[in-house]
Amino acid sequence: MSTVQDYPSRLSRPESRKMGTFSYLPPMGEAEIRRQVEWIVKNGWNPGIEHTEPDFAAQIYWYMWKLPMFGETDVDAILAELKACHEANPGHHVRLIGYDNFTQSQGANMIVYRGTAV
Protein backbone atom coordinates (compact mmCIF):
# COMPACT_ATOMS: atom_id res chain seq x y z
CA MET A 1 0.00 0.00 0.00
CA SER A 2 1.33 3.42 -0.86
CA THR A 3 1.38 6.33 1.52
CA VAL A 4 0.44 9.91 0.80
CA GLN A 5 3.25 12.38 1.28
CA ASP A 6 2.35 15.32 3.49
CA TYR A 7 3.30 18.78 2.25
CA PRO A 8 3.71 21.15 5.20
CA SER A 9 1.53 23.93 3.79
CA ARG A 10 -0.25 25.88 6.50
CA LEU A 11 -2.30 29.07 6.39
CA SER A 12 -0.48 30.28 9.49
CA ARG A 13 2.87 30.09 7.63
CA PRO A 14 2.69 32.19 4.42
CA GLU A 15 6.07 30.95 3.18
CA SER A 16 4.73 27.38 3.10
CA ARG A 17 1.62 28.05 1.00
CA LYS A 18 1.42 26.24 -2.30
CA MET A 19 0.00 27.96 -5.39
CA GLY A 20 -0.81 25.41 -8.05
CA THR A 21 0.81 22.26 -9.36
CA PHE A 22 4.24 23.68 -10.18
CA SER A 23 4.66 25.12 -6.68
CA TYR A 24 5.38 21.62 -5.35
CA LEU A 25 8.38 21.39 -7.67
CA PRO A 26 11.68 23.24 -7.37
CA PRO A 27 11.57 26.79 -8.81
CA MET A 28 11.79 26.92 -12.59
CA GLY A 29 14.90 28.36 -14.19
CA GLU A 30 14.89 30.60 -17.24
CA ALA A 31 15.09 27.65 -19.64
CA GLU A 32 12.08 25.93 -18.04
CA ILE A 33 10.06 29.14 -18.06
CA ARG A 34 10.91 29.63 -21.74
CA ARG A 35 9.71 26.10 -22.52
CA GLN A 36 6.41 26.75 -20.75
CA VAL A 37 5.90 29.99 -22.71
CA GLU A 38 6.77 28.19 -25.95
CA TRP A 39 4.22 25.51 -25.09
CA ILE A 40 1.50 28.13 -24.49
CA VAL A 41 2.32 29.81 -27.82
CA LYS A 42 2.48 26.46 -29.66
CA ASN A 43 -1.04 25.64 -28.46
CA GLY A 44 -2.31 28.96 -29.82
CA TRP A 45 -3.26 30.24 -26.38
CA ASN A 46 -3.18 33.91 -25.42
CA PRO A 47 -0.72 34.69 -22.64
CA GLY A 48 -1.76 36.86 -19.74
CA ILE A 49 0.23 38.07 -16.74
CA GLU A 50 -1.09 38.71 -13.24
CA HIS A 51 0.53 39.60 -9.92
CA THR A 52 -0.40 39.94 -6.26
CA GLU A 53 1.07 40.27 -2.80
CA PRO A 54 1.99 36.91 -1.22
CA ASP A 55 -0.45 37.51 1.65
CA PHE A 56 -3.36 37.68 -0.82
CA ALA A 57 -2.25 34.95 -3.23
CA ALA A 58 -4.95 32.54 -2.08
CA GLN A 59 -7.68 34.96 -3.13
CA ILE A 60 -9.39 34.60 -6.49
CA TYR A 61 -8.57 38.05 -7.83
CA TRP A 62 -5.04 39.05 -8.79
CA TYR A 63 -3.94 42.32 -10.41
CA MET A 64 -3.75 42.10 -14.18
CA TRP A 65 -0.49 43.29 -15.73
CA LYS A 66 -1.66 45.22 -18.78
CA LEU A 67 -4.11 43.38 -21.04
CA PRO A 68 -3.77 39.74 -22.10
CA MET A 69 -1.34 39.48 -25.00
CA PHE A 70 -3.90 38.43 -27.62
CA GLY A 71 -2.26 36.76 -30.61
CA GLU A 72 1.28 37.23 -29.31
CA THR A 73 3.63 34.59 -30.71
CA ASP A 74 6.99 36.16 -29.82
CA VAL A 75 8.29 34.21 -26.83
CA ASP A 76 10.91 36.87 -26.07
CA ALA A 77 8.23 39.58 -25.88
CA ILE A 78 6.23 37.50 -23.40
CA LEU A 79 9.32 36.82 -21.29
CA ALA A 80 10.17 40.54 -21.35
CA GLU A 81 6.69 41.39 -20.04
CA LEU A 82 7.02 38.79 -17.27
CA LYS A 83 10.33 40.32 -16.26
CA ALA A 84 8.93 43.87 -16.43
CA CYS A 85 6.04 42.88 -14.18
CA HIS A 86 8.43 41.28 -11.70
CA GLU A 87 10.72 44.32 -11.69
CA ALA A 88 7.79 46.70 -11.19
CA ASN A 89 6.40 44.53 -8.36
CA PRO A 90 9.45 42.87 -6.78
CA GLY A 91 7.70 41.52 -3.69
CA HIS A 92 4.73 40.06 -5.56
CA HIS A 93 3.97 36.64 -6.98
CA VAL A 94 3.85 36.87 -10.78
CA ARG A 95 1.94 34.26 -12.72
CA LEU A 96 1.61 33.40 -16.37
CA ILE A 97 -1.75 32.31 -17.74
CA GLY A 98 -2.50 30.72 -21.09
CA TYR A 99 -6.06 31.53 -22.18
CA ASP A 100 -7.58 28.94 -24.49
CA ASN A 101 -9.96 30.59 -26.98
CA PHE A 102 -11.63 27.33 -27.95
CA THR A 103 -12.64 26.18 -24.47
CA GLN A 104 -12.86 29.75 -23.16
CA SER A 105 -10.86 28.83 -20.10
CA GLN A 106 -7.36 28.89 -18.70
CA GLY A 107 -5.32 26.17 -20.32
CA ALA A 108 -2.22 26.94 -18.27
CA ASN A 109 -1.60 28.81 -15.06
CA MET A 110 1.74 28.93 -13.24
CA ILE A 111 3.63 31.19 -10.88
CA VAL A 112 6.81 32.28 -12.60
CA TYR A 113 8.22 34.54 -9.87
CA ARG A 114 7.47 33.97 -6.20
CA GLY A 115 7.28 37.02 -3.97
CA THR A 116 8.61 37.18 -0.46
CA ALA A 117 6.21 36.12 2.27
CA VAL A 118 5.65 38.60 5.07
From Swiss-Prot:
Q: Which UniProt keywords apply?
A: Calvin cycle, Carbon dioxide fixation, Photosynthesis
Pfam families membership: RuBisCO_small
Q: Tell me one GO biological process term.
A: reductive pentose-phosphate cycle
Which residues are listed as membrane-spanning? Answer: none
For molecular function, the Gene Ontology terms on record are: ribulose-bisphosphate carboxylase activity
Domain of life, per UniProt, equals Bacteria
Q: Which Gene3D superfamilies match?
A: Ribulose bisphosphate carboxylase, small subunit
Q: What does this protein do?
A: RuBisCO catalyzes two reactions: the carboxylation of D-ribulose 1,5-bisphosphate, the primary event in carbon dioxide fixation, as well as the oxidative fragmentation of the pentose substrate. Both reactions occur simultaneously and in competition at the same active site. Although the small subunit is not catalytic it is essential for maximal activity.
What family does the entry list?
Answer: Belongs to the RuBisCO small chain family.
The miscellaneous comment for this protein is: The basic functional RuBisCO is composed of a large chain homodimer in a 'head-to-tail' conformation. In form I RuBisCO this homodimer is arranged in a barrel-like tetramer with the small subunits forming a tetrameric 'cap' on each end of the 'barrel'.
Share what the entry says about its subunit structure, partners included.
Heterohexadecamer of 8 large and 8 small subunits.
Q: What is this protein called?
A: Ribulose bisphosphate carboxylase small subunit
Could you tell me the gene encoding this protein? Answer: cbbS
